[in-house]
Regions:
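N-terminal active-site segment of His-dependent metallophosphoesterases
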Residues: 1-68, 154, 163-168, 189
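Short coil/turn segments at beta-strand junctions that form active-site/ligand-binding loops
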Residues: 15-16, 53-56, 74-75, 106, ...
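Hydrophobic alpha-helical membrane-insertion segments
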Residues: 31-32, 71, 90, 136
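Short helix-loop-helix/strand-helix junction enriched in hydrophobic and basic residues
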Residues: 61-62, 78-82
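Conserved beta-sheet core of the metallophosphoesterase superfamily
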Residues: 77, 84, 88-189
Length: 189
């Protein structure tokens, strides 16, 4: 269990690992223009290779066609992105849906778009498809001196990020203290 998480979110890690990904854009017509160089089927295989039945998969928005996610047996959480039109279309495919950013721990904010914060918290997000900005990205850790982690699929080579490993390897070690904010009331399901 990831004890760093606020109590309501600890259940995500009770039986397995917590994985995150963003911007899968399954079946989106503009997918090739965003630097995607693998098929949806190949991308799904990479997700399923790590994320299993007892795990939790947190998708940080811009899902595309959610039917692709039926093949993933994990508990699924969505933080909606700018291409995700309504929560209603995703309810059959996700166990929890958040319409905006959510603090899952004192120093960890999940969002679709990056939220500039200085060093108050660590922002895990997607949205930015420019991989050249994120050369120091590491699957099991974090980039030294960075307070954000961009998990847009094409930026992270279509791999899911293991949150527990990231925390263990110092994900939030260079973040100053933060007071609990109340924007995590965006839950819709």
């Amino acid at each position: 269990m990831i004890k760093t998480l606020y109590k309501p979110f600890q259940r995500w890690s009770e039986k397995g690992s917590v994985y995150l990904i963003s911007d899968t854009h399954f079946d989106d017509s503009d997918r090739p223009f965003m630097g995607y160089n693998i098929s949806e089927k190949e991308q799904l295989y990479l997700i399923k290779e790590n994320c299993h039945k007892n795990d939790t998969l947190i998708h940080l928005g811009d899902v595309g066609n959610p039917k692709w996610l039926e093949q993933i047996k994990a508990y699924k959480v969505l933080v909606m992105g700018n291409h995700d039109e309504t929560a209603t279309q995703f309810k059959p495919y996700f166990d929890e849906i958040y319409t905006g950013p959510v603090f899952i721990a004192e120093k960890i904010l999940l969002s679709h778009e990056p939220i500039i914060n200085g060093s108050a918290w660590y922002n895990i997000h997607g949205h930015d498809h420019d991989a050249s900005k994120y050369k120091e990205w590491k699957v099991d850790g974090f980039a030294e001196g960075w307070n954000d982690l961009n998990l847009a699929s094409n930026v992270v080579d279509y791999k899911v990020y293991n949150l527990g490993k990231g925390i263990k390897h110092g994900l939030i070690s260079n973040v100053d203290g933060v007071h609990r904010l109340t924007i995590d009331k965006a839950r819709t399901k």
